[in-house]
Amino acid sequence: MIVKVQGGGKVYANTGSCSDVVSYLQHEDAERLQAGLTPEPFFNQEQDRISPKEVTNKIDNNRKGLKAKEAKFYVITVAPSRAELREMGATKEEQAAAMKEYIRTEVMPKYAEGFNKGLKADDLEFYGKIHFERHEKDGEDLHAHIIVSHKTKNNGKSISPMTNHTGKKNTGAAQGGFNRKEWYSS
């Protein structure tokens, strides 16, 4: 499984509203409707069907205390290998359902734990979107994008996957940084 935190530039610009990212992540919806297929909605830890408006509202209003030029959210891409996709199911629908479950039970819990702040996936404000096509890549196409807030769901803690893991105590009981290498390899 390839897991990557996207940079904050171009379509993934993250210092303002997430509306452009939410809009971009819907690019497959019109194509799927034209083909007679159901668009894949946004999802989070608890729900399978979340409107783009709600995603934008929740992420954009979860930024208490962040500076103007500070990232407000991050975008994570999760892409399974061909073998992993086969294990997820025979149809695209089965694979999409398995991918959502994988994100809920593996990716986001490990992401939360990676901050060493006693967080769980339920503490995160995140929204995922399954995509079935990748026009610029060869090979298997199914992948997911996850928009995750820079702040925990209760606006209480600032968390960034871009901080470097130090393994040292910074203040109080919290350890500094986020160990991306350990998270990516799990």
Predicted region positions:
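N-terminal nicking endonuclease/strand-transfer module with a His-rich metal-binding environment
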Residues: 1-186
